[in-house]
Amino acid sequence: MSKICQITGKKPITGNNRSHAMNATKRRFFPNLHFHKFWNPKTKRFIILRVSAKGMRNIDKLGLNSLKIKKLHK
């Protein structure tokens, strides 16, 4: 399953691990994703989304119906 937030569209980015001797090895930085169940009052059902912490704050602030939900790529 892809590691992409369904609200913000955040994805993993690449960077380097740096040792004490400043040797560089490639690594990936992953977004803080969680499966979370949200109540949709419009449809009176729960929706399970894979969202980042920032995506959860956006849902709390703006509401679930005002945000565009991106589909997960399988």
From Swiss-Prot:
NCBIfam families per the UniProt record, alphabetical? L28 (TIGR00009)
InterPro entries assigned to the protein according to its UniProt record, in alphabetical order: Bacterial_rp_bL28, Ribosomal_bL28, Ribosomal_bL28/bL31-like_sf, Ribosomal_bL28_bact-type, Ribosomal_bL28_sf
Q: Does the keyword Ribonucleoprotein apply?
A: yes
Q: Which GO terms describe its cellular component?
A: ribonucleoprotein complex; ribosome
Say which family it is in: Belongs to the bacterial ribosomal protein bL28 family.
Asked whether the UniProt record includes Ribonucleoprotein among its keywords, one would answer yes
Q: Which domain of life is it from?
A: Bacteria
Q: Under what name is this protein listed? A: Large ribosomal subunit protein bL28
Q: Which Pfam families match?
A: Ribosomal_L28
Q: What's any GO biological process attached to this entry?
A: translation
Q: Which keywords annotate this record?
A: Ribonucleoprotein, Ribosomal protein
Q: What is the lineage of its organism?
A: Bacteria, Pseudomonadati, Pseudomonadota, Gammaproteobacteria, Enterobacterales
Which Gene Ontology molecular-function terms are recorded? structural constituent of ribosome
SUPFAM superfamilies referenced in this protein's UniProt entry, alphabetically: L28p-like
Matching HAMAP family: Ribosomal_bL28
